[in-house]
């Protein structure tokens, strides 16, 4: 069965430069949405969206109804800021999505892209988590917007490290005024200071368009979608492939093309969805970020205005929750970089609002709702940071019709671990080139051995469980020791393993 997908993006800066990140309208997040359905459902979705557009025909601009019809100031306190007409419009739009919809969302930090380029020579190790360090640097710059650091980054990247060191040292000193709230931040900043010794000047600060399509490719694989087309909103010069389209093709997506949104309702739907989510996330960011003249060590909560909701406004949160969390849910449905606090906060807000049945439920303990919501968001951020510590890749199993799948080294791994052959060892030393070590369900250790014509996966003797779990833990901390030659020694009732 063929599937039709449509792509659009929001909060995109074509070039990243000093004026980009210091402008009044700047927002660090870049968002993309890809929506789609089976081709036999295309007509039904098209009819629904055309009915929606005609109902609000007076809102069209240049013949199109897109997310620009909702202005940022109309979401300054989230859906609580919307008037009745806009509540009705968004409710009608969200209702177009049903269980036949496939929705993929991507979010990235513009500053994270710059920092990743500057520190591209650094790698995770068992001794230092570079992902966490990059996260801390990005969060510090996005949250505090230190002018001297940002200016040094663009005027003279060679001066960036010195400026960042000065800024972090200053923040550590200021944070000591309230270690109850800032102890964790200080620990992170102190760790970052330990590695700020060398930095490579980036080759380019142009935006990298690949990440959103890498995640979408994983989403398609996880869903088992093989026959599809992807249509992107056309940007740039006519007759010339955009960087976005080139990136989509580079990542292996097939049947990709771009077109004018006025000719394709699916692109307009993607624009509406990603635009509304982008504006909502932007308002959430500004509401949770301290202003320049506010005390930096104070806890920042959403104002009570976010929670003065009517039943209709609350229903919008519940509808959007259904779209983001429930319709054709998947591990890769929402894809982001390491620094994705705004996205995580947005998901936390949806989760929090969804548990209310009516606006009266919110009113029962109204004054405490900002605190309760903050706790919900904080827990999500904490879980995200814990997941970030896990360095082992998560990959979709592409073919679930067979009784086995192929691991990253191309070896057969049976779903029923009892069918996995055991590595046969003779008395004395047995040498193998080991590609990887893992743990199957039930705690059974596995090893992938280099072989011809294909690598082979075996069960290891139970005596090597502790050895295997240690290596998995090291890999999870960023220290992968394989491939490498391993000597398995069988002596009496014991088996030993030595990495050469």
What is each stretch, according to the model?
Residues 1-19, 189-192, 349-362, 416-435:
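Generic detector of solvent-exposed, compositionally biased contiguous segments
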Residues 426-427, 467-487:
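Short nucleic-acid-contacting surface segments enriched for D/E, G, S/T with interspersed K/R
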Residues 1-82, 90-97, 102:
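An N-terminal structural lobe/cap that precedes and organizes the functional/catalytic core
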Residues 83-88, 211, 463-468:
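Short linear interaction motifs
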Residues 51-66, 431-467:
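Short, contiguous, well-structured surface segments enriched in hydrophobic/aromatic residues
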Residues 82-85, 92-99, 475-480, 489:
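Short, charge-rich binding segments
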Residues 97-398:
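Charge-dense, low-complexity intrinsically disordered regions
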Residues 394-453, 492-500:
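OB-fold ssDNA-binding interfaces and closely related basic DNA-contact patches used
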